[in-house]
């Protein structure tokens, strides 16, 4: 490896050739502020446009941006000269002069990178006055709010949308003072190819991109006495919510989270993991049927709503490959309202209000899909995110970190370890393989850990020997990688039998409205490890071993993929390509 030797603040350091001054400074634990820069090399996410100029440092007699200047042999860098510090201050002051001064009521207050840098630089007044740019706020979707008055043109969202997700909704428009990152022709997000994956939100350093706030609606539901309000919680939430209360990323906070939800006033606190186990029952059966018939392969998983939006808009002619299974959120809601409510609690489905807590803003949109319900009663009434739940807990004055742990309620609170790993890339496929293997072979699977489908590579593939039969599998993370694999499928080059797709890099643990990771991918890794730790700790690690699931089939669903199971647990998809004027319903079993 070719190394470059340089000095930063009189400290010597050696870095690989091609490294930047910022890379070298990090090796010395010297902090240089950045706004536009984002480098999550583990998942190939890099935004290095050097546009904000907040990272200016002194080299010789001049100033250069640390994030975009390569380290050179013998270079002498000073990060804390008067010239460098004043340059940073001026840049931040200019940004603030064209920025709304509403920090106290901004959704990003306390997590805003611009706010943090301004505080660290000791900026206490806005010296520059003048005309402010204006952009309308887009509230057209049920998931994302676009408030570009707060945009600082860092281009992170543009990189994420175009380079990583290949959706291509956001781009720079206009010139000079009128420059902004926007949709084509200032089109509302609801009328674009946006999949609502929320990754633009996860990397936005300010409050320019946020989620639709559903907290008031949940409070209203909790404070009225007309309906029984129940809540379900996704697996990724339990290993991330602790971050909002000072706990380390990946801390397993399941029991404390349940206690907090009960303190908020939810009548019953259930686990989306029950829905995940149920999803595996249906999806494994569906896969086995298709595999034996060699029909509609490869089967594409359907748990991720952003992925479903993506394939509906980009590959509608291949929707026949998509599993008809609802997501765990949808399956849970359907069972809660059509089994739990009438048969266990003796109440009408319309009198149950189901709230979901998800790591994902696309789940808000998923709840609103008309096909996800029965008789105009939605499976899930409303979805909030991990951060929204944290806000509700704080509003109620609850100290989550010091709560005594409480268990989920029965019967929809029981789950296996297979359900927990749904929250990380490869988890859905691994859970499906655990069940499919035993159903195909009628033999016990001794080692349930499928390490070949684990890890954070964007595309992982493996050939699994199922008692002499080879099953070729693929795990895909990010929509850009999904596009690559779909193009292989279309060209006939694909050898896969089953493909798992998650829109977020690393899976749901990196969802668009989890606690902000600020570009630190180690946080996402710790969350994923937390889920694997939960799986390892459970006695039952195969979905078909869940006693409550077995009871549900015996009492209500009959068997996987039965007629009644299809009625409540399966769905259909639509051609949403802009090429077509009318939505066309497409299902995989027609």
Model-derived regions: residue spans:
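Eukaryote-biased recognition of intrinsically disordered, low-complexity regulatory segments
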Residues: 1-11
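Iron-sulfur-associated redox domains of electron-transfer enzymes in respiratory
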Residues: 5, 18-74, 80-84, 88, ...
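Short, contiguous acidic and Ser/Thr-rich linear segments
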Residues: 11-19
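Fe-S ferredoxin-like electron-transfer domains
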Residues: 53-196, 209-221, 228
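Cysteine-centered loop/knuckle micro-motif
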Residues: 161, 204, 253
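Structural motif corresponding to the C-terminal cap of alpha-helices
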Residues: 165, 204, 340-344
């Amino acid at each position: 490896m070719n190394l470059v030797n340089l000095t930063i603040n009189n400290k010597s350091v050696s870095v690989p050739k091609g490294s930047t001054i910022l890379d070298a400074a990090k090796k010395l634990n010297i902090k240089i502020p950045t706004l536009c820069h984002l480098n999550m090399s583990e998942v190939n996410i890099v935004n290095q446009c050097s546009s904000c100029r907040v990272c200016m440092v002194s080299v010789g007699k001049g100033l250069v941006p640390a994030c975009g200047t390569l380290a050179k042999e013998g270079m002498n860098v000073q990060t804390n000269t008067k010239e460098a510090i004043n340059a940073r201050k001026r840049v931040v002051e200019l940004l603030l002069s064209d920025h709304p001064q509403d920090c106290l009521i901004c959704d990003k207050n306390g997590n805003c990178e611009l706010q943090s840098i301004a505080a660290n630089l000791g900026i206490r007044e806005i010296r520059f006055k003048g005309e402010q740019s204006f952009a309308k706020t887009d509230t057209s979707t049920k998931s994302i709010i676009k408030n570009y008055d707060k945009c600082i043109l860092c281009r992170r969202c543009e990189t994420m949308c175009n380079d990583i997700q290949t959706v291509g909704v956001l781009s720079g428009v206009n010139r000079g003072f009128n420059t902004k990152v926007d949709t084509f022709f200032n089109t509302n997000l609801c009328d674009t190819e946006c999949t609502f994956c929320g990754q633009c939100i996860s990397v936005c350093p300010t409050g320019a991109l946020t989620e639709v706030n559903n907290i008031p609606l949940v409070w209203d539901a909790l404070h009225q006495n007309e309906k029984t309000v129940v809540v379900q919680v996704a697996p990724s939430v339990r290993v991330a919510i602790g971050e909002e209360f000072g706990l380390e990323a990946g801390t397993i906070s399941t029991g404390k989270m349940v206690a907090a939800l009960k303190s908020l006033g939810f009548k019953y606190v259930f686990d989306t993991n029950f829905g995940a186990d149920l999803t595996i029952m249906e999806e494994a059966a569906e896969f086995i049927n298709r595999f034996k018939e060699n029909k509609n392969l490869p089967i594409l998983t359907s748990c991720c709503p952003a992925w479903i939006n993506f394939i509906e808009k980009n590959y509608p002619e291949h929707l026949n490959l998509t599993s008809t299974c609802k997501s765990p959120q949808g399956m849970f809601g359907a069972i809660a309202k059509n089994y739990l409510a009438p048969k266990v609690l003796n109440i009408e489905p319309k009198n149950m209000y189901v709230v979901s807590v998800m790591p994902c803003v696309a789940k808000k949109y998923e709840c609103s899909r008309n096909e996800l319900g029965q008789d105009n009663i939605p499976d899930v009434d409303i979805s909030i995110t991990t951060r929204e739940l944290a806000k509700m807990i704080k509003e109620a004055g609850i100290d989550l970190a010091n709560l005594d742990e409480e268990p989920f309620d029965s019967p929809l609170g029981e789950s296996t370890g297979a359900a927990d790993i749904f929250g990380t890339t490869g988890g859905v496929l691994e859970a499906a393989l655990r069940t499919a293997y035993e159903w195909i072979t009628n033999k016990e699977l001794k080692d349930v850990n499928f390490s070949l489908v684990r890890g954070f590579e964007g595309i992982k593939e493996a050939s699994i020997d199922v008692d002499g039969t080879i099953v070729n599998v693929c795990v895909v993370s990010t929509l850009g990688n999904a596009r690559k694999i779909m193009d292989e499928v279309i060209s006939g080059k694909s050898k896969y039998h089953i493909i798992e797709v998650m829109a977020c890099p690393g899976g749901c643990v990196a969802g668009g409205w989890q606690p902000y990771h600020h570009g630190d991918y180690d946080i996402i890794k710790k969350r994923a490890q937390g889920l694997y730790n939960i799986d390892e700790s459970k006695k039952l690690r195969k979905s078909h071993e869940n006693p409550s699931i077995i009871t549900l089939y015996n009492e209500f669903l009959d068997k996987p993929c039965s007629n009644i199971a299809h009625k409540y647990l399966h769905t259909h998809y639509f051609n949403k390509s802009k090429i077509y004027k009318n939505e066309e319903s497409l299902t995989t079993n027609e």
